[in-house]
């Protein structure tokens, strides 16, 4: 385990490695983003990005095929897309369509193109599509009236791709988590050129804080995890065109709010970040989820 001294002056809200695992970006209530080189257990601060006027909640690296690009979501209602060229960082775009805190950003799988989804406390989700000519199309829709806390993309194939084969991109889908206690599934409809509600997943009894779609490599069904202020994590599964099935991750509630959920790259291990300052790792075995480990400071 490597410890990184971020030198932030306030609480850290997100830390994310790039595609190659060699750069770490962190963000904080001090309104800054820091980018580090992480190699051979050595950390080097490469840049401190300043542009937000409020806490920065979440970050997202774009796929490297689009360049060295980082998106940041802030309480100030802005999403800033940063680009590094020749070692110099600059603002590529300042997205100002939202009327309240932007709580989450998520880049689409690269098979879908350079697409960025943003979730806001104004209840809306915006999807930015960056074009090769430098232009950007924006679509915005109301996802959760009381506020939207998280957004994630479906993997490029939802049918359980065969290992070794390149999955078809398939239809574009999003999952969102909101202050209405719901998880919603959205599909892009080219006919109306916007996002259409496909499914509503009810089960939590307090705000849903995060949602994460499992990678589909080698899996025979679709897995989706949701984390909630009600101290529960649910696993939602779907086979083919069948209905979504809900399974509690644990028999007992977590000791505190379940803030974040994250799948391993292979989709077989789920990490849960909890308000008790621990990260819990789970793996499915014989249709039951078993605790593998607890990580704490």
From Swiss-Prot:
Domain of life: Eukaryota
Keyword annotations from UniProtKB, A to Z: Cytoplasmic vesicle, Endoplasmic reticulum, ER-Golgi transport, Membrane, mRNA transport, Nuclear pore complex, Nucleus, Phosphoprotein, Protein transport, Repeat, Translocation, Transport, WD repeat
Biological process, per Gene Ontology: COPII-coated vesicle budding; mRNA transport; positive regulation of TOR signaling; protein exit from endoplasmic reticulum; protein import into nucleus
UniProt keyword Zinc present: no
Residue stretches of each WD repeat: 7-46, 51-92, 97-138, 143-196, 203-246, 253-292
Predominant location: membrane
Recorded GO CC terms: COPII vesicle coat; cytoplasm; cytosol; endoplasmic reticulum membrane; GATOR2 complex; nuclear pore outer ring; nucleus
Single annotated GO MF: structural molecule activity
Subcellular locations according to the entry: Cytoplasmic vesicle, COPII-coated vesicle membrane; Endoplasmic reticulum membrane; Nucleus, Nuclear pore complex
Keyword Glycoprotein belongs to the record: no
Membrane topology: Peripheral membrane protein
Pfam families (alphabetical): WD40
Modified sites of kind Phosphoserine: 29
Coiled coil feature spans: none
Protein role: Component of the coat protein complex II (COPII) which promotes the formation of transport vesicles from the endoplasmic reticulum (ER). The coat has two main functions, the physical deformation of the endoplasmic reticulum membrane into vesicles and the selection of cargo molecules. It also functions as a component of the nuclear pore complex (NPC). NPC components, collectively referred to as nucleoporins (NUPs), can play the role of both NPC structural components and of docking or interaction partners for transiently associated nuclear transport factors.
Quaternary structure and interacting proteins, as annotated: The COPII coat is composed of at least 5 proteins: the sec23/24 complex, the sec13/31 complex, and the protein sar1. Component of the nuclear pore complex (NPC). NPC constitutes the exclusive means of nucleocytoplasmic transport. NPCs allow the passive diffusion of ions and small molecules and the active, nuclear transport receptor-mediated bidirectional transport of macromolecules such as proteins, RNAs, ribonucleoparticles (RNPs), and ribosomal subunits across the nuclear envelope. Due to its 8-fold rotational symmetry, all subunits are present with 8 copies or multiples thereof.
Family: Belongs to the WD repeat SEC13 family.
Designated name of the protein: Protein transport protein sec13
Species for this entry: Schizosaccharomyces pombe (strain 972 / ATCC 24843) (Fission yeast)
């Amino acid at each position: 385990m490597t410890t990184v001294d971020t030198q932030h002056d306030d609480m850290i809200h997100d830390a994310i490695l790039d595609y190659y695992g060699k750069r770490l970006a962190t963000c904080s209530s001090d309104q800054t983003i820091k980018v580090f080189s992480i190699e051979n257990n050595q950390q080097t601060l490469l840049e401190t990005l300043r542009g937000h006027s409020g806490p920065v909640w979440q970050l997202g690296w774009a796929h490297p095929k689009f360049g060295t690009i980082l998106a940041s979501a802030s309480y100030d209602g802005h999403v800033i897309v940063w680009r590094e060229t020749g070692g110099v960082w600059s603002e590529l775009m300042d997205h100002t369509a939202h009327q309240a805190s932007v709580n989450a950003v998520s880049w689409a799988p690269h098979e879908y193109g350079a697409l960025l989804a943003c979730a806001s406390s104004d209840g809306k989700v915006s999807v930015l599509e960056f074009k090769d000519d430098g232009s950007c199309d924006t679509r915005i829709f109301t996802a959760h009236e009381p506020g939207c806390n998280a957004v994630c993309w479906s993997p490029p194939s939802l049918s359980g791709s065969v290992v070794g084969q390149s999955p078809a991109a398939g239809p574009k889908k999003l999952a969102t988590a909101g202050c209405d206690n719901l998880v919603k599934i959205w599909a892009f409809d080219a006919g109306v050129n916007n996002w259409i509600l496909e499914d509503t997943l009810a089960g939590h009894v307090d705000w849903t804080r995060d949602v994460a779609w499992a990678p589909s490599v080698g899996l025979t069904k679709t897995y989706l995890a949701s984390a909630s202020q009600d101290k529960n994590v649910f696993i939602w599964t779907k086979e083919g065109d069948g209905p979504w099935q809900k399974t509690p991750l644990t028999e007992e509630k977590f000791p505190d709010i379940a803030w974040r959920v994250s799948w391993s790259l292979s989709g077989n291990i789920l990490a849960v970040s909890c308000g008790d300052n621990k990260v819990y790792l789970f793996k499915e075995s014989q249709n039951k989820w078993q605790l593998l480990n607890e990580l704490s400071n």
